[in-house]
């Protein structure tokens, strides 16, 4: 989790759309719809294989109108990344506010993350596969936002080690094992599927927490 008083880095799209707050609510709504529709196209075709003409067609805009809402194709990619990170960080904030033991917080973080993956499968596909296409400052901001979330997970693990709840594990490596376990559910965790985010969250937590828990009696593993 982020330490008290730490300033969170802003969304990448603030670079190219710093005047968004001056736009109308209708403009924002239409822009968000473009982001969502384009995420589906990128997830189906890939970012580099998708041209502006196709994006205009699926969104029902001419090129001039499209650029009124989206400054560039890369800005659109950044907005998709921001959609994922905004939702993930909101979930992490809810976990921090709820408090509880390190085990409870790690389980809640998992449920929140799986919920985002379940609700935004196309955005998450783009997030995981197309981030190398971000350049310069956008790439730097994405890495920092991703690292901020990783620090939250690592902090929960460190708390568990400090209290004796978890074994003496490497927080950095363990966080990445935890993230890998959850992130790639995008391959099969689909809205309307047989398994919901909540269905997956409990067994995931059980498997992971049993793996890192200190054995009963406090004997070192």
Residue ranges and their predicted role:
Residues 1-18, 112-115, 119, 150-162, ...:
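C-terminal peripheral helix-coil segments that are non-catalytic and often amphipathic
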Residues 27, 35, 77, 81, ...:
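Amphipathic, non-transmembrane alpha-helical scaffold segments
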Residues 33, 37, 41-75, 79:
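Helix-turn-helix
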Residues 79, 93-122, 174-178, 201:
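Hydrophobic alpha-helical connector segments
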Residues 86-93, 137-162, 172-176, 199:
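Amphipathic alpha-helical packing segments from all-alpha helical-bundle domains
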Residues 105, 117-137, 187:
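Amphipathic alpha-helical segments used for helix-helix packing
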Residues 125-128, 169, 219-221:
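Short, hydrophobic secondary-structure boundary micro-motifs
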């Amino acid at each position: 989790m982020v330490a008290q008083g730490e300033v969170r880095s802003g969304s990448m799209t603030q670079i190219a759309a710093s005047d968004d707050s001056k736009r109308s609510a209708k403009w924002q709504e239409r822009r968000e719809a473009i982001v969502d529709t384009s995420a589906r196209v990128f997830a189906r075709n890939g970012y580099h294989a998708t041209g502006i003409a196709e994006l205009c067609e699926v969104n029902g805009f001419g090129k001039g109108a499209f650029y009124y809402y989206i400054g560039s194709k890369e800005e659109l990619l950044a907005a998709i990344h921001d959609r994922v990170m905004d939702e993930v960080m909101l979930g992490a904030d809810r976990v921090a506010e709820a408090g509880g033991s390190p085990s409870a917080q790690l389980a809640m973080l998992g449920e929140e993350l799986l919920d985002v993956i379940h609700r935004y499968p196309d955005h998450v596909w783009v997030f995981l596969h197309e981030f190398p296409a971000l350049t310069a400052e956008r790439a730097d901001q994405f890495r920092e936002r991703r690292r901020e979330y990783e620090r939250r997970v690592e902090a929960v693990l460190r708390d568990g080690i400090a209290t004796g709840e978890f074994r003496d594990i490497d927080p950095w490596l363990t966080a990445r094992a935890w993230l890998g376990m959850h992130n790639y559910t995008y391959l099969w965790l689909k809205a309307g599927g047989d398994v919901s985010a909540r269905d997956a969250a409990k067994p995931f937590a059980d498997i992971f927490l049993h793996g890192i828990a200190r054995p009963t009696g406090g004997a070192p593993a």
